[in-house]
Amino acid sequence: MNKDELKAFVLANPRLVSMKPAGDGIYVLKYSKRVFYEDLWNDFLEECRGTIVDEDFNVVSRPFTKIYNYGVEAKAPVLANDVKVTAYRKANGFMVAMTWHNNDILVSTTGSTDNDYVGYAKEMMLKHMCWEDWVLAIASNEGHTFMFECVHPSDPHIIVEKTGMYFLGWRENSWDSRVHGFDCDTVWKIFAQDTIKCHAVESYHMTVGELVAESKRVRHEG
């Protein structure tokens, strides 16, 4: 992603994406509801799902790029039934990103650094370990963004999920980074359970055909 092209797009399209101030010269990029309902996604908007940038659009925090629903959205990948994949159970909560910024943990959701959901996330973080231990874990990995699914009792869903933080993966704070975690099961599960003492989502190795069939039987979200 070219940061100058992204900045030009964001500034030229306020009806499609907001640039919400988050203090100290940083901004949260968030797509509008119109993008979601009218399926207006493009390469720029795919990155505007809670990414935090400075005034020059250098990355401060970079959560997931948009992931398309397989078999539902037109831009989702198309794979043959015999292709082998690794699937991860989707925890039923809301996305949280963390990075080290200005000598503290910067916690954010897909659109804010100071809403109720950020408060919920911080509350759930303390169920796993004390704030000082979180500071040590995140500060020792400065320059990276860590992604979680947070399940909080004040954000109920039809499918009941165990409360807490579910570690999903991490990536470097740069525009050319890729998400890590999904390609190294053992390492990231050890990090989730031993270093940050969070839940780790289950993974399954199977073919696409087997996965599609299994998705019709399971009772969790996806």
Regions found by a protein language model. Give the residues of each.
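Core nucleotide-handling region used for phosphoryl-transfer chemistry
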Residues: 1-222
